[in-house]
């Protein structure tokens, strides 16, 4: 594990960019960027286009301002290159950004008010590959739809079970038990989640990171942020607009952003580089300001 990267993730001001759209969400991401589905004929072409979009973002001067401390990548982006360098190496060596890899394979159908991650027996193999690419950590998402005690306990147990396997490969996991912002009893679900997270953290011997939905009650996750086994807590934008997400985030001290959609809002394939860079820089500045409050 890279100690300098560990320090950066523990305390550097800034936020984590999420560029980890996978097969299912790529068409939506491309459409928002102004590339219609008829612009590509195959999955291969679709992934090439999204790689071009991500390359444009990562090589933009806006990405070199030191305000983004980490970035979450999709597998194919990790295996790809930027300006002739493997993506993770380019991020760290040219941008001083810590690379993470999305490792889950999507969600199971809802049961007990939650969606667990699909089983993934190849997790260890993917972790080894990530280590070979000089990736620092991972991220995996599951979703809480209802304030169901059993369901939430299952979600947290699965996240920590995967997390321990990831740690055994020398990677730092970002656990992401997202609470759906439309959950009818969101505050109650968050109470159960916090209790279960603290119970698991108390049993850990190595620190992890956590990615959460911005809580209903401001500063609700304070004990988790201060827990010795918690490296950093980041927040997802969860369907809020960037403005709304930034506003909510700025009220939660010690939590930094890990936005995907909110980061690419307003970017378009048709923009000139100057327009694209200016828009990206403004987005990064907004999210950064909300993260350091």
From Swiss-Prot:
EC class of the enzyme, as a word: lyase
InterPro entries noted in UniProt: Aldolase_TIM, FBA_I, FBA_I_Gram+-type
Reaction(s) this enzyme catalyzes, per UniProt: beta-D-fructose 1,6-bisphosphate = D-glyceraldehyde 3-phosphate + dihydroxyacetone phosphate
GO biological-process terms attached to the record: glycolytic process
Keywords: Glycolysis, Lyase, Schiff base
Pathway: Carbohydrate degradation; glycolysis; D-glyceraldehyde 3-phosphate and glycerone phosphate from D-glucose: step 4/4
Keyword presence, Lyase: yes
EC number: 4.1.2.13
Active-site residues from the entry: 176 (proton acceptor), 211 (schiff-base intermediate with dihydroxyacetone-p)
A Pfam cross-reference name: Glycolytic
Domain of life: Bacteria
Gene3D superfamilies: Aldolase class I (3.20.20.70)
Molecular-function GO terms, alphabetical: fructose-bisphosphate aldolase activity
Record-linked NCBIfam families: PRK05377.1
Family listed: Belongs to the class I fructose-bisphosphate aldolase family.
Listed name of the protein: Fructose-bisphosphate aldolase class 1
Gene source species: Porphyromonas gingivalis (strain ATCC BAA-308 / W83)
